[in-house]
Design a protein with these regions (language model features):
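Generic structural hydrophobic/aromatic packing signal, biased to beta-strands
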Residues: 15, 19-22, 65, 91, ...
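Well-ordered alpha/beta subsegment
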Residues: 85-100
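Intrinsically disordered, low-complexity regulatory segments enriched in Ser/Thr/Pro
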Residues: 58-82
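Short, well-structured alpha-helical interface segments that form or flank functional binding sites
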Residues: 17, 49, 86
Length: 100
């Protein structure tokens, strides 16, 4: 499900996989795998380079930035965590704007 306006993710359960397009400031949420959410956004016009995975815990209003799709040695991200603080902050801000 692509999210372009504020929504409450509580109906998805206690844990929701999301992918954030940091350029378009939209989210895809609720997919079984982060890559499925990424495909949804790419089909909608997003570029993979702008997509970053995270996990949202709506009840606790918590975010973790762990996803296999975040491993990008070519972009200096060698971990499942988002290592670039600017990108991480952007992902966090977009999630907070659209979810919390």
């Amino acid at each position: 499900m692509i999210i372009k306006e504020k929504i409450f993710l509580g109906s998805f359960g206690s844990f929701v996989k999301v992918v954030v397009d940091i350029e378009r400031e939209i989210i895809s949420a609720g997919c079984e795998l982060h890559v499925d959410c990424a495909e949804e956004l790419i089909t909608d016009g997003s570029l993979y380079v702008n997509l970053w995975g995270a996990n949202v815990y709506p009840k606790d209003k918590k975010i973790d930035f762990i996803s296999l799709m975040n491993i990008r040695p070519a972009d200096n991200n060698r971990s499942m965590d988002i290592e670039n603080p600017v990108i991480k902050k952007r992902v966090e801000d977009i999630i907070k704007k659209l979810v919390f």
